[in-house]
């Protein structure tokens, strides 16, 4: 049990960081397509730590703080996903299709908690972003890659050993 949790935490951190980078890249692309500055998402990430001042403060500070905050949260969400998945059946853990569904739902749950619960109290400027777009981005560009990376990792672990060759 402890070994399974330890492995799930490790897989979760790795998958969370990779999915977090993918999500950040898509947030940047989305910002540009909507006519906003490319690094506006990084400023938003930084505002979790620095408050509203990150939106107009020095860009260098926002880049460093925003990147660290975003990756730290991505790793934490990855750990939560990994620990949740540790309780699922091997069939579900290794199925790309099932994991895709679970991952998208997880991404939507992350969006809901972050935007509809926490942001309403602590970060009201987050609510100025298009919420449907944010929900889709969290599901498709964080939750989905997180789940598929996790499933690929589980498939490697649970793959049958190759048959021994006879001479």
Regions found by a protein language model. Give the residues of each.
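Membrane-interface interhelical connector segments
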Residues: 34-59
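Transmembrane alpha-helical segments of integral membrane proteins
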Residues: 83, 111-124
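Hydrophobic cores of alpha-helical transmembrane segments in multi-pass inner/ER membrane proteins
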Residues: 76-79, 138-151
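N-terminal signal-anchor transmembrane alpha helix
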Residues: 2-35
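Internal alpha-helical transmembrane segments of multi-pass membrane proteins
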Residues: 10-12, 86-109
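Short, charged juxtamembrane terminal tails flanking transmembrane helices
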Residues: 1-6, 154-167
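Hydrophobic alpha-helical transmembrane segments
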Residues: 63-85
């Amino acid at each position: 049990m402890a070994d399974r949790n330890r492995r799930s935490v490790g897989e979760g951190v790795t998958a969370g960081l990779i999915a977090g980078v993918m999500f950040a890249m898509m947030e940047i692309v989305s910002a540009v397509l909507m006519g906003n500055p490319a690094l506006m998402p990084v400023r938003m990430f930084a505002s979790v730590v620095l408050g509203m001042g990150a939106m107009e403060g020095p860009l260098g500070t926002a880049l460093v703080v925003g990147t660290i905050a975003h990756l730290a949260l991505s790793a934490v969400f990855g750990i939560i996903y990994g620990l949740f998945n540790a309780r699922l059946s091997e069939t579900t853990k290794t199925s790309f299709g099932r994991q895709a569904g679970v991952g998208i739902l997880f991404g939507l749950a992350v969006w809901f908690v972050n935007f509809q619960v926490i942001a309403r109290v602590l970060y009201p400027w987050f609510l100025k972003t298009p919420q449907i777009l944010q929900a889709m981005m969290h599901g498709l560009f964080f939750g989905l890659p997180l789940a598929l990376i996790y499933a690929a990792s589980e498939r490697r672990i649970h793959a049958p050993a190759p048959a021994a060759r006879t001479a």
